[in-house]
């Protein structure tokens, strides 16, 4: 739970004592891993009512004790620090000053943004560190303890996209997704062990719909990340741009991503939903599809690739800049150029590379379409993308 790209790693057919099962549940939280219930045995036909009642009592007692520990590590300051220290020991700490400064800056900005949406963040300010893992991931564990993999910084040179990843994890933290998931897991594991047959554990799993909550939680965290971003100067198109980048960069090694696809929404779905958030933020004026940005249903620009960023990824950043302009009423002023940058009021829209259309041409086009009425049924109802990490001045 909470990990950007984490999936079940608990081995099948391994028998644990109740204490070890609970410990496994809690330990997995350090890595924000969803748990498997494959260790619960097949129901016994001889299990009667008395067995089930006894299992209920045993499960309640065991889960109550485990929940007391869970509450300690999740909510008390002492427990949060113990958990944070364990996370650092478990994952390793990268002392790189540049990466840590970037994380510090983003966390400072996002913490203020989260507070504007949910003041409860002040009750448990986030602890965070950069770990040594070179893969792409970030996770929020118990007690608002967070970590970002070193590899995430390498894959995402844009601070806007990095901020979206971190905002996503803070969304998990604010909604207590990790603790809630562990709580369910403890109850199921305790109940299953108490029967010795897995009958109650199987029923509990069905009733609580345990791991099936992962996709809704991921969607909720993405939506919260977008909301947090709109309370900062980061580009609101960063979420859509991020998922476009992930799809493109991981084509050559899909196996590294297939580990989590059953637990998380697909990358293209997450991109499209985030682009819809951007369109809504613009008041329905700005959309993007297939690398083309539309304003009021009319083609504005198809950004070219630049550096290691594709035209499609850039288009989501352009969409984000335009959405910010419309949201903040900069569209009431004329578009113009500052060198190779197209401006709309005080809002930068796109920094044109040599492969893009001329900035003056784009400014003239934007002036011609920004006040027109949206064309129903046009491609603007699809999705949005944005340019190379330009920030939204709000």
Kindly label every feature range from the protein language model:
Residues 54, 177-207:
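Post-HEXXH active-site segment of zinc metalloproteases
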């Amino acid at each position: 739970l909470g990990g950007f790209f984490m999936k079940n790693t608990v081995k099948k057919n391994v028998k644990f004592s109740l204490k070890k099962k609970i410990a496994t549940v809690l330990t997995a939280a350090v890595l924000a891993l969803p748990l498997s219930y494959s260790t619960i045995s097949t129901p016994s036909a001889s299990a009667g009512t008395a067995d089930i009642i006894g299992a209920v009592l045993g499960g309640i007692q065991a889960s109550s004790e485990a929940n007391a520990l869970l509450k300690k590590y999740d909510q008390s300051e002492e427990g949060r620090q113990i958990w944070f220290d364990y996370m650092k020991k478990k994952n390793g700490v990268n002392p790189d000053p540049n990466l840590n400064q970037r994380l510090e800056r983003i966390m400072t900005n996002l913490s203020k943004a989260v507070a504007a949406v949910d003041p409860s963040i002040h009750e448990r300010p986030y602890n965070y560190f950069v770990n040594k893992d070179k893969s792409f991931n970030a996770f929020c564990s118990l007690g608002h303890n967070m970590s970002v993999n070193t590899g995430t910084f390498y894959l995402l040179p844009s601070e806007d996209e990095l901020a979206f990843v971190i905002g996503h994890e803070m969304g998990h933290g604010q909604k207590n997704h990790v603790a809630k998931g562990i709580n369910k897991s403890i109850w199921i594991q305790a109940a299953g062990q108490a029967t010795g047959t897995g009958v109650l554990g199987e029923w509990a799993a069905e009733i609580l719909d345990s791991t099936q909550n992962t996709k809704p939680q991921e969607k909720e965290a993405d939506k919260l990340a977008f909301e947090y971003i709109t309370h900062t100067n980061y580009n609101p198109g960063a979420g859509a741009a991020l998922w476009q980048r992930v799809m493109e960069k991981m084509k050559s090694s899909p196996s590294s991503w297939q580990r989590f696809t059953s637990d998380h929404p697909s990358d293209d779905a997450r991109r499209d939903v985030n682009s819809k958030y951007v369109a809504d933020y613009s008041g329905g004026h700005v959309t993007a599809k297939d690398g083309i940005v539309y304003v009021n249903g009319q083609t504005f620009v198809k950004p070219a690739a630049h550096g290691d960023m594709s035209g499609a990824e850039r288009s989501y950043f352009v969409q984000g800049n335009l959405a910010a302009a419309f949201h903040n009423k900069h569209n009431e002023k004329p578009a113009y150029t500052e060198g190779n940058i197209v401006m709309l009021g005080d809002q930068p829209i796109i920094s044109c590379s040599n492969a893009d259309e001329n900035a003056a041409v784009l400014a003239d086009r934007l002036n011609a379409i920004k006040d027109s009425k949206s064309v129903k049924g046009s491609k603007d109802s699809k999705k949005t993308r944005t340019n190379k990490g330009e920030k939204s001045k709000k």
